[in-house]
């Protein structure tokens, strides 16, 4: 039932939808470039201006072969009316053009059967005479357990046999034909067409979900419990699809990937438009939803939706996507991108059953734990974080931190071009300098002290330098960011991808500290 266009921007297929406490029912999903449509079947009048049906009255005559030409399912034992489950080709019901699979039978010859059990309705139809007048209304959300066909092109062969038993979950059709005085011999072609109104079964929009800044999840909200072959999509305004149940695991993955692709494309296009209004050093590199794991294990909701953005020098953590310039000033948290550490978690590092996770360690040493839905989402985040870090390091070129050496106030500059420079804070006199390549190892006490192990270029001996910082994690992460940027400079593929951004970033004004030797 599904297909994709060459650009993979559209997809259509049949799924089940569970909306609240209702039984799942069949819907059609249609994915367009910027919207997800959920459609349900309804019967509408198409003569003149289309309008939706309420109750319709249908009169059909019994035939010698095939009877009324319909089968039924359901009943009060399942808290639903009896519904038409099959319509025989070239039989009375089919030729009338007024009866459809999914029609709930409300009255039979004026007898109210809305709350009748299946067998009771069967008996009423068997004893209805040669002509029966049905009051029907299309049951748009027929429970999936009825397994109704989506259209009238189903095999339901006519028969003149009768059956004495019926089941509400099986098609009761053959035993509806019994009528002792039936002498009808009219041919199918002699059945008159219905004058006046003409009805058709169509797919009608039930819910429309704009994809820009929307999010989707396979997990039960707030937990690490994944639904089997099911997901939901939530629009930026909070409108939710309900739980969409796919027919197979493969089908579910296809839908999720297609939705993720369209959301990603919309986000990239939106970022380009927004970046026109921001200077070079304030460009957005990434925007997207994830779920943050609460640090308090006693919380009822372990995970909560979080919107992350990488812009300029900062990682922003929002409760909702920023729309205006003012929104960017109201982030829940903000971090300097070169002073934090991002780690993609292996299976052995995961805290629960969620698979695609990463952590961000802040400049204060706080660990933030995040989860995304797809492996491709995780890869996209990792690339974006590397890009944002590289661009910011390339822009600032150097960073200086206050430190203490043997009770003396010093400064340590991490310079992208020259490496490490330690100088006296008062006199600016340089005590020592080393290139990045000379750093052979380091260790820290987790509180304030870092011991650097540098190799002397002349003696080849290892020289230990210990410094004390008030912001240990910020320094460690900054060193890591500068090293990562150095490594990225050796990767032709990375540099090729960043050529445009790097050129723009290098044109920005940068300031460097001056030293005396």
From Swiss-Prot:
Gene3D superfamilies: 2.30.42.10
Domain PH: 283-390
An example Gene Ontology molecular-function term: structural molecule activity
This protein's UniProt keywords: Actin-binding, Cytoplasm, Cytoskeleton, Nucleus
CDD domains tied to this protein: PDZ_syntrophin-like (cd06801), PH (cd00821)
GO annotations of cellular component type: cytoplasm; cytoskeleton; dystrophin-associated glycoprotein complex; nucleus; ruffle membrane; syntrophin complex
InterPro entries according to UniProt: PDZ, PDZ_sf, PH_domain, Syntrophin, Syntrophin_4th
Tissue expression as described in the entry: Brain specific. In CNS, it is expressed in the perikaryon and proximal portion of the neuronal processes. Strong expression in the hippocampus, neuron-rich dendate granule cells, and pyramidal cell layers. Highly expressed in neurons of the cerebral cortex. Also expressed in the cerebellar cortex, deep cerebellar nuclei, thalamus, and basal ganglia. No expression in muscle cells.
Main location: cytoplasm
Domain PDZ: 57-140
Pfam families documented for this protein: PDZ, Syntrophin_4th
Localization, UniProt: Cytoplasm, Cytoskeleton; Nucleus
Domain comment as written in the entry: The PDZ domain binds to the last three or four amino acids of DGKZ. The association with dystrophin or related proteins probably leaves the PDZ domain available to recruit proteins to the membrane.
Subunit and interaction comment: Isoform 1, but not isoform 2, interacts with the dystrophin protein DMD and related proteins DTNA and DTNB. Interacts with DGKZ.
Role noted for this protein: Adapter protein that binds to and probably organizes the subcellular localization of a variety of proteins. May link various receptors to the actin cytoskeleton and the dystrophin glycoprotein complex. May participate in regulating the subcellular location of diacylglycerol kinase-zeta to ensure that diacylglycerol is rapidly inactivated following receptor activation.
Name used for this protein in its record: Gamma-1-syntrophin
Gene: SNTG1
